[in-house]
């Protein structure tokens, strides 16, 4: 068992510049999900989309190479990797020689897969894509699509998750809506540092009260939780209180330490969106 308090997060850490897979610090999802009343298989699908902006290694002649990395971690994995440990792990590539980018990509895939699937009855694999400088121009920027809840002039008084703010018109005809907000903010449960995010909520079902939904999202402002847990809490609260037929919650968190984490949870299996950053990322 690796409690978050034992991770390198919030502590002084030596900068290791020789490849070291043991720097990865897995944290069990089950502990966080138990707080949401989830035991056993989770009632959703999805993944955590990571972007690593600070990845470098040496080629066989000692010349530095750089790349962006997109990592896709299925939400079915029993563990996540604590973000600072992942940064330290990537830093450990910086003075290590590799034959080519494909070898680096394969090493990251193998190491992260082993960390997040640790303890599973059957292990799977994470997705890893490296983009070299010749492809940097293909990395576009796009905001989350949907009707902005932030247009609403609501009074906000609660800054801890308040699911009682959520409601839906269960006697009305089902609708399909895609709603967004730039106002999601929570705090790291270990360091207390702020985590800022844009969030998109797509659903089909009874019309959700938009003012209450915005107030609910704002209520995370002083909440302590990892990115993945916050998105799962939002999903579970909406699923329980508003009872949509279909639901997808997708948040894109601003970058910290050269990494951004973008969890998506959905009630029905679907293709993942392109990992495309927003302006604040």
Swiss-Prot record:
Keywords: Cytoplasm, NADP, Oxidoreductase, Queuosine biosynthesis. NADPH binds at residues 83-84, 256-257. InterPro entries: GTP-CH-I_C/QueF, NADPH_dep_7-cyano-7-deazaG_red, QueF, QueF_N, QueF_type2. Its main location: cytoplasm. The keyword Oxidoreductase applies. Its EC number is 1.7.1.13. The active site is at residues 188, 195. It is found in: Cytoplasm. One of its GO terms (molecular function) is preQ1 synthase activity. One of its GO terms (cellular component) is cytoplasm. GO terms for biological process: queuosine biosynthetic process; tRNA modification. Gene3D superfamilies: 3.30.1130.10. Pfam families: QueF (PF14489), QueF_N (PF14819). Substrate binds at residues 81-83, 227-228. SUPFAM superfamilies: Tetrahydrobiopterin biosynthesis enzymes-like. Disulfide bonds: none annotated. It catalyses: 7-aminomethyl-7-carbaguanine + 2 NADP(+) = 7-cyano-7-deazaguanine + 2 NADPH + 3 H(+). Belongs to the GTP cyclohydrolase I family. QueF type 2 subfamily. Catalyzes the NADPH-dependent reduction of 7-cyano-7-deazaguanine (preQ0) to 7-aminomethyl-7-deazaguanine (preQ1). Homodimer. This is NADPH-dependent 7-cyano-7-deazaguanine reductase. It comes from Verminephrobacter eiseniae (strain EF01-2).
